[in-house]
Amino acid sequence: RSRGLGDVYKRQVFTTYSALPVFTDIGLVDFFSFTWAPSEGHYGIMSLLAGSGLVTVGALAMGVPLGVGTAVYLVEIASKRVRRLISPAVDLLAGIPSIIYGFFGMIIIRPFIAQLTGGLGFGALTAWFVLAIMIVPTITTLTIDALNSIPMGIREASYAMGATKWQTIYKVVLPAAKLGIVDAIVLGMGRAIGETM
């Protein structure tokens, strides 16, 4: 165990030592600026972070409602037959490597966006669509787990009080599964951020 920690400390010291030129040669002000011109020696990281943030927020805005909605449909509304068909497909999509999604985006989505906007299709809108498609299966799978963890007795108590199915979903099931849904969204966001860096 101590050997493992020693290796971690050695790596940390090496990484810190290797990163020192960023602070000594470039400087913190230039490093955290919006100027990115490597040929001129300007390595501002803020434009890269802003782009990653913009694309991640757009992907979440598109992917979260679709992922949570799909999970609610599969757990609360869909028949067993539909569930048996769609659930394995969602699990399969969650395991597809990111490079495949990127290729799909370049071949299918980019030309569609280019035709729609009249541009080349290289931009935030294309990235939003690709990342949203990428994070939906992750959010859906984890939200399904969160919804399935809610005891059936809670739903039955809601029905016994006269609530409709939609009232039960909106007022009882979703609030009870809120923490699991937030976890699903955070993991989806992590995947989106990881792909934009």
Regions found by a protein language model. Name each.
Residues 17-59, 79-80:
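Periplasmic/extracellular loop-to-transmembrane helix junction in inner-membrane transport proteins
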Residues 91-135:
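Generic hydrophobic transmembrane alpha-helix motif, especially the helices
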Residues 66-105, 142:
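Cytoplasmic-entry segments and transmembrane alpha-helices of multi-pass inner-membrane transporters
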